[in-house]
Amino acid sequence: MKTIAFFDAKSYDRESLANFRNDELIGTGKIGRCFADICEGFGMNILGFDPYESPEFAGKYVTLDELLEKSDIISLHCPLTRENKHLISDETISKMKKGVYIINTSRGQLIDTQALNNGLKSGKIGAAGLDVYEEETSLFFEDFSDEVITDDTLSTLIAMPNVIVSSHQAFLTKEALSAIAETTVKNFLDYFSGNELKNEISV
């Protein structure tokens, strides 16, 4: 979706380093906890919100409002439900710190994209990293490189220098695909052998 030079010659703001920043996770399942471990390695303070708290989460659980108010970075790692559609909205953005960073590698409809655009334009949101998009189905899974993007909301996002959009394939590495295949096969073998299912999802 967007080409980024490997080396961008400019003066970087060294006051925005991650150390001692508050990184807030919405969703503390396996992926959220892995991300928390990475952030902890950078010396970040890890806070989390999840209706189903995990004893394996190494950070501190807080309410959603407290998370929004304290966040330097908000990263979404939760499934999409009827209750959390547009979790990031004009209302929740208004509760955030000025300059907050938002990361979404989960589900596009967790974010009201127009509200995100408004927050970015006003400076309330400092930057966004998106591997998913609210209307991605008709845009992300075919090659439109020779066509004009008619989705004005997405076009606005892509044009912003403080936004990175990838087409729901940031995971697409040789190592990740191999791990997915191995885990899937092992899940089948464990199921049919009557073994413990380490990746079981209760519905």
For each feature predicted by the language model, list its residue ranges:
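N-terminal glycine-/charge-rich "phosphate-binding" loop or analogous flexible N-terminal tail
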Residues: M1-L25
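Conserved beta-strand positions in the Rossmann-like core of class I SAM-dependent methyltransferases
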Residues: A5, L47, Q109
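Active-site flanking residues adjacent to catalytic metal/cofactor-binding acidic residues
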Residues: F7, I26, F49, L130, ...
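Short, charged/polar "capping" segments at the starts of alpha-helices
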Residues: S11-S16, E53-F57, T137-L139
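Rossmann-like dinucleotide/phosphate-binding beta-alpha-beta segment
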Residues: I26-K98
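Glycine-rich nucleotide-phosphate-binding loops and adjacent flexible coil segments
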Residues: I103
